[in-house]
């Protein structure tokens, strides 16, 4: 079965270079975090990759990342496709509000794939390292897809303590699950900091402890092809319900929309737990830690020095 990895990379800056965190080299041969996600997805069995970018960065993206990955994937019989998130791509009858410059969010980003997505798929952020286990579990879930399972989704559930930064506060989707391991709610929680006891929310210096063993969503979802129509319907409703005061800043966010569907009883989301440690460059100070972490993984034999060598 065809299974696709969708990489949300439209947030990459329009200038490529040392200042763009998504393109900061972290591997021994200049690999970026995205390289490791692509490697792990292919190793797990994904056989198609869709990059969501913006048209204004297409040439630079292909020069820095895309062409190199296309060559690797061609040799591995993995299909590559592009989708473009644009501010002006709106539902029929909706005009771009004057003065709007902010992108419409991750929901619109995934919706940009509508013409190239016809199979079960996983969605990830371009600049997060998720570890190998989550890709294997998502792939194994997605290959069980059938049309009668159109509303059965999954997500990778990371342990909160494995997703925190040593260098400052982070925002995470704290998850509630039932006894069967299905998601019941996602609470977007800001200002989470690492503490000697585990984790806490920092409210202007007032720390409130939270369970560091909670599941956290890192925007790694397993979804079905039918979801694309639901997502489009949701985007139309997003505009229909939006007040004028929100028109310049409101965002259509994937986890919030999935939670709306969940609360309405329209979908189920199986939480696939992973004990892998998440890495990301939330703060510039995180980069050294990420580089050292990949060096340790290579030393331990988790990855080859030449990253894609073991897939050939």
PLM-predicted stretches and their roles:
Residues 2-70, 85, 119:
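N-terminal glycine-rich phosphate-binding loop and ensuing alpha1 helix
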Residues 13, 129-131:
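A short, conserved beta-strand element in the Rossmann-like catalytic core
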Residues 70-119:
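Short phosphate-binding loop-to-helix
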Residues 91-103, 168-173, 285-289:
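Short, surface-exposed amphipathic charged segments that create phosphate/polyanion-binding patches used
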Residues 119-129:
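Short beta-strand-to-loop acidic/aromatic patch adjacent to the donor-nucleotide binding site
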Residues 132-220, 225:
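Conserved core of the sugar-phosphate nucleotidyltransferase
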Residues 232-267:
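A C-terminal functional module that forms or caps the active site or interfaces directly
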Residues 263, 268, 278-280, 284-312:
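Hydrophobic helical membrane-anchoring modules
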């Amino acid at each position: 079965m065809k299974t696709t990895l969708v990489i949300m990379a439209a947030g990459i800056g329009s200038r490529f270079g040392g200042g763009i965190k998504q393109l900061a080299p972290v591997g021994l041969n200049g690999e970026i975090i995205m390289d490791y996600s692509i490697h792990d997805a292919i190793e797990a069995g994904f056989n198609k990759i869709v990059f969501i970018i913006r048209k204004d960065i297409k040439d630079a993206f292909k020069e820095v990342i895309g062409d190199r990955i296309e060559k690797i994937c061609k040799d591995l019989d993995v299909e590559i496709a592009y989708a473009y998130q644009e501010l002006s791509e709106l539902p029929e009858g909706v005009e771009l509000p004057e003065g709007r410059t902010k992108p419409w969010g991750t929901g619109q980003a995934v919706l940009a794939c509508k013409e190239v997505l016809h199979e079960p798929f996983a969605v990830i952020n371009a600049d997060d390292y998720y570890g190998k286990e989550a890709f294997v579990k998502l792939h194994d879930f997605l290959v069980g897809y059938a049309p009668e399972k159109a509303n059965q989704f999954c997500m990778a559930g990371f342990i909160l303590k494995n997703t925190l930064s040593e260098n400052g506060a982070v925002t995470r989707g704290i998850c509630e699950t039932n006894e069967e391991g299905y998601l019941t709610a996602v609470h977007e929680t800001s200002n989470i900091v690492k503490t000697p006891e585990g984790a806490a929310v920092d409210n202007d210096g007032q720390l409130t402890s939270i369970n560091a063993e909670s599941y956290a969503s890192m925007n790694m979802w397993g979804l079905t092809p039918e979801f694309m129509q639901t997502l489009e319907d949701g985007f139309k409703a997003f505009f229909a319900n939006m007040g004028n005061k929100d028109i310049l800043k409101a965002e259509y966010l994937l986890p919030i929309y999935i939670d709306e569907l969940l609360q309405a009883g329209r979908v189920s989301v199986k939480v696939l737990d992973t004990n892998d440690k998440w890495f990301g460059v939330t703060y510039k100070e995180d980069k050294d830690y990420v580089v050292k972490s990949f060096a340790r993984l290579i030393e331990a034999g988790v990855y080859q020095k030449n990253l894609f060598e073991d897939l050939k």
